[in-house]
Amino acid sequence: MTDLAKIVEDLSNLTVLEAAELSKMLEEKWGVSAAAPVAVAAAGAAPAAAAEEQTEFDVILAAAGDKKIEVIKEVRAITGLGLKEAKDLVEGAPKTVKEAASKDEAAKIKAQLEKAGAKVELK
């Protein structure tokens, strides 16, 4: 058996505790940390996640809640719809109130509708 094959065989026979101790011993001897590659990989993944962050949202009225008249007033103010159209939108929930809104605008609309008593989703 070659030296490398013997090392592989010996490592395969270690218990979990022995393997952990071996890892610590090698870290000390070589002056490295086993956690470093994980941290580097996580740091490399963060910019990719930030690049994929959603910038446009659809504001969806999930349910009007108990204060339907207040919700209709807010929908009219937000969308500029007439009374009948706003009423139909609210009663037909779930419906999209605003499409492709910026993150700030979507959050503002959501807050307005929730204050009026509606249940709102951002997609």
Swiss-Prot record:
Reply yes or no: does the keyword Zinc-finger apply: no
User: What's an example GO BP annotation here?
Assistant: translation
Q: Does the keyword Heme apply?
A: no
Molecular function in Gene Ontology: mRNA binding; structural constituent of ribosome
What residue intervals traverse the membrane? none
* Annotated InterPro entries: Ribosomal_bL12 (IPR000206), Ribosomal_bL12_C (IPR013823), Ribosomal_bL12_C/ClpS-like (IPR014719), Ribosomal_bL12_oligo (IPR008932), Ribosomal_bL12_oligo_N_sf (IPR036235)
In which family does this protein belong, per the annotation?
Answer: Belongs to the bacterial ribosomal protein bL12 family.
Q: Which GO terms describe its cellular component?
A: cytosolic large ribosomal subunit
Q: Which Pfam families match?
A: Ribosomal_L12 (PF00542), Ribosomal_L12_N (PF16320)
The record's note on quaternary structure and interaction partners says: Homodimer. Part of the ribosomal stalk of the 50S ribosomal subunit. Forms a multimeric L10(L12)X complex, where L10 forms an elongated spine to which 2 to 4 L12 dimers bind in a sequential fashion. Binds GTP-bound translation factors.
Q: Which UniProt keywords apply?
A: Ribonucleoprotein, Ribosomal protein
Q: What does this protein do?
A: Forms part of the ribosomal stalk which helps the ribosome interact with GTP-bound translation factors. Is thus essential for accurate translation.
- In its UniProt entry, the species of origin is given as Parvibaculum lavamentivorans (strain DS-1 / DSM 13023 / NCIMB 13966)
Residues making up the signal peptide according to the UniProt record:
none
The protein's name: Large ribosomal subunit protein bL12
Name the source's superkingdom: Bacteria
